[in-house]
């Protein structure tokens, strides 16, 4: 197993159909990642896949290349109706469904297949209009897919390829009954190409694979290095009093090019967002109750570099590929050890290095033993000098739940706060 992100194997060597290869190369991909090099040859021979790989290792392109190649080499049923897609790709979140769709666009164009999206929270009529015209590939979340299915807008009787992405997250969010409902309305497993991908493959996920797939090949990439060799991990033990000031101080010292800060609650995220915004950072807030259009706009701005910091709950921790994230902060240690791996997996992607900083505060330090047991290593501890923390921070204009000590020198100044070195703002 190569220690580098890319292998010496190129997509051109795999035997992909020319149209698929053109779509892959249109996205700038030439050499395969390990998960791509191991799974695509199996998919081209019709093997079912249950694949495990760290986030950011290219599993989306792996299953998309396998899917489009299968469509080109296998004819649709002669009895297939307009409302019957040939492919169903299921994702746990709206954001991931949209991301998969966007990643698939070059291949859909080069191969000549139509795609549709189905996810809740936004765009019902627009999605409906596309589906009524007929699609080859349907990508979406289970709830909206079932909604269209029960209305007769779509029918799954002609499905030839099914993909389940982030399967462990499906369990976490309680979607497994929905998934089984959809599987029962498809042709039997032996008549489909089936793929299941996840950053972790627990026993329950493997049981799901064997229940609804045809002798799946279990592919596991770098299981021993769960948190990524390119991620520098660091742990602080701040008091609740120092916690916000420590975050602001570290942000001031490092000026991350692109950072994601995770908190465990919506209110916690709102507080962190307010303090960073008051301190002059270009920061976005992503929590579960942010409207869908605004969520997508925030992600687009963060990806494009219009925002430097994203404060989020775990809604953004799984599946999303945001390139060039230099820092991840666990402002709160997560309650679920798997979420720690998924959170810090936002950085150190595509062969780049990353920095993951975690706070074991008075409220969440008890989560640390489970995290270190799950990752099979202790997180290196760093100390800080409380007297060296920032002492002239700008108070947010709105009232927030997190109060800094009254002896700190907070000034309610009208300036835009600190600015990134190099005159970036």
From Swiss-Prot:
Keywords: ATP-binding, Cytoplasm, Helicase, Hydrolase, Nucleotide-binding, RNA-binding. Its main location: cytoplasm. GO terms for biological process: RNA catabolic process. Residues 405-425 are annotated as: Disordered. Residues 416-425 have a biased composition (Basic residues). Pfam families: DEAD (PF00270), Helicase_C (PF00271). GO terms for molecular function: ATP binding; ATP hydrolysis activity; RNA binding; RNA helicase activity. One of its GO terms (cellular component) is cytosol. The keyword rRNA-binding does not apply. InterPro entries: DEAD/DEAH_box_helicase_dom, DEAD_box_RNA_helicase, Helicase_ATP-bd, Helicase_C-like, P-loop_NTPase, RNA-helicase_DEAD-box_CS, RNA_helicase_ATP-dep_RhlB, RNA_helicase_DEAD_Q_motif. Its EC number is 3.6.4.13. It is found in: Cytoplasm. SMART domains: DEXDc, HELICc. SUPFAM superfamilies: P-loop containing nucleoside triphosphate hydrolases. A motif (DEAD box) lies at residues 165-168. PANTHER family: ATP-DEPENDENT RNA HELICASE RHLB, ATP-DEPENDENT RNA HELICASE RHLE-RELATED. Component of the RNA degradosome, which is a multiprotein complex involved in RNA processing and mRNA degradation. This is ATP-dependent RNA helicase RhlB. It comes from Tolumonas auensis (strain DSM 9187 / NBRC 110442 / TA 4).
């Amino acid at each position: 197993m190569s220690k580098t992100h890319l292998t010496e194997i190129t997509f051109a060597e795999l035997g992909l159909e020319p149209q698929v290869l053109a779509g892959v190369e249109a996205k700038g991909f030439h050499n395969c990642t390990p998960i791509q090099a191991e799974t695509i040859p199996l998919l081209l021979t019709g093997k079912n896949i249950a694949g495990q790989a760290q986030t950011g290792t290219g599993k989306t392109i792996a299953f998309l290349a396998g899917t489009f190649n299968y469509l080109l080499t296998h004819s649709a049923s002669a009895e297939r109706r307009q409302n019957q897609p040939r492919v169903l790709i299921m994702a746990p979140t709206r954001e991931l469904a949209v991301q998969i769709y966007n990643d698939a666009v070059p291949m859909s164009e080069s191969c000549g297949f139509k795609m549709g999206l189905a996810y809740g929270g936004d765009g019902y009529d627009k999605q409906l209009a596309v589906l009524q015209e007929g699609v080859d590939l349907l990508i979406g979340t289970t709830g909206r897919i079932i909604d269209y299915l029960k209305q007769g807008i779509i029918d799954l009787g002609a499905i030839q390829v099914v993909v389940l992405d982030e399967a462990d997250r499906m369990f976490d969010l309680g979607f497994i009954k929905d998934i089984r409902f959809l599987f029962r309305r498809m042709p039997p497993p032996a008549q489909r190409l089936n793929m299941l991908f996840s950053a972790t493959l627990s026993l329950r996920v493997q049981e799901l694979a064997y229940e609804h797939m045809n002798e799946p090949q279990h592919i596991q990439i770098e299981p021993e290095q769960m948190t990524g060799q390119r991620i520098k991990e660091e742990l602080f033990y701040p008091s609740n009093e120092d916690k916000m000031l420590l975050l602001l101080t570290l942000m001031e010292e490092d000026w991350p090019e692109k950072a994601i800060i995770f908190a465990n609650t919506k209110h916690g995220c709102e507080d962190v967002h307010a303090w960073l915004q008051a301190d002059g950072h270009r920061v976005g807030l992503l929590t579960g109750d942010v409207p869908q259009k605004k969520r997508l706009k925030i992600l687009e701005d963060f990806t494009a570099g219009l925002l430097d910091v994203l404060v989020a709950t775990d809604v953004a921790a799984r599946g999303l590929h945001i390139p060039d994230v230099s820092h991840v902060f666990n402002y709160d240690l997560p309650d679920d050890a798997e979420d720690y791996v998924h959170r810090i997996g936002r950085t150190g992607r595509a062969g780049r290095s990353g920095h993951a900083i975690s706070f074991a505060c008075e409220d969440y330090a008890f989560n640390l033993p489970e995290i270190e047991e799950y990752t099979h290593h202790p997180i290196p501890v760093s100390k800080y000098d409380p007297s060296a923390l920032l002492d002239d921070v700008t108070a947010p204009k709105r009232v927030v739940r997190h109060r800094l000590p009254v002896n700190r020198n907070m000034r309610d100044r009208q300036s835009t706060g600190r600015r990134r070195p190099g005159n970036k703002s």
